[in-house]
Amino acid sequence: AHATSSHGLAHAAASVRIGVAKSTKPDTAEATEAALRQLASKLGGATPDVVLVVLCGANPQEPSPYDLEACLARLRVGEHALAASTKVVATTSCMGIAVESQWVGGNAIALMGICDPEGSYEVCYADASQGSEAVRERVAAAAARSGREEPPAVSIVFTQGHETTSLRGIQAALGEEAHLVGGCIFLANPPGLAVSPGGGGRDESATSGLVMLLCWPNATVAS
C-alpha cells in the first residue's frame, strides 16, 4: 500500500505551474514575442518544460496571417525565448480560441506553458497516412523516452486527417483506456502541425498527420 500525506500532495501541486497567454497582433514575430512576454509573466519567470502553441486564423476561407515555422523559430530567440530544453507541440486552427475562459475570435497566437520539473512530458509527430502501425511506433517511442512504466495520465492530440487511423495507433501504443483530449483541425488555412522536442532534437512539421503531448504530471489527475 502507498499513502501520501495531504502536505505531500499540496507540495507536489504547488511545484506545478501552468500559464496561458495570447496575442492578436497580425504579424507572426510580433504576436509570438508578445505571447512569450505574457507567458513569462504568468509563470513568474520560471522556465516551462513544455509549451503548447495554437496559431489561429480568423476565416477558414482566407489564409491565416501566421506562419507556423516562423513562429517555432521565434519561440527560441529574444528576451523571453524558450529554453533549449523546452518541448513544443504546435498546431494551426481557425475561427477563434478560448484562453482563460474567454473566447478570442479571429486571428490570435495562444500559448500554454507547463512548469513541472518533477513530471515527464514528451511530444511526437506521426504521419498517419502511413497507417496505424506507423502511428503506434512513433507514440510508443515517445512514451519510452519518458522512462515511465505507467501510461501517461493524459495526452493531448491534434489531427489533420486520418483520425480513425490515428486513434487506432495511439490505442495500440498506450492501451484502449488511454485518456485523450484534443480534436481535428481540418478547417485550418493553411493546415499545419509541428513538434520541437528540445534538447537538440530535430523539429518536425507537416500539413497532415497528428501531434501529441504525452503528460505524466507531478500532481494528482482525476480520471
Which residue stretches match the model-derived regions?
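Intrinsically disordered, low-complexity segments
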Residues: A3-T4, A13
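Cofactor- and metal-binding active-site motifs of prokaryotic enzymes
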Residues: L9-S223
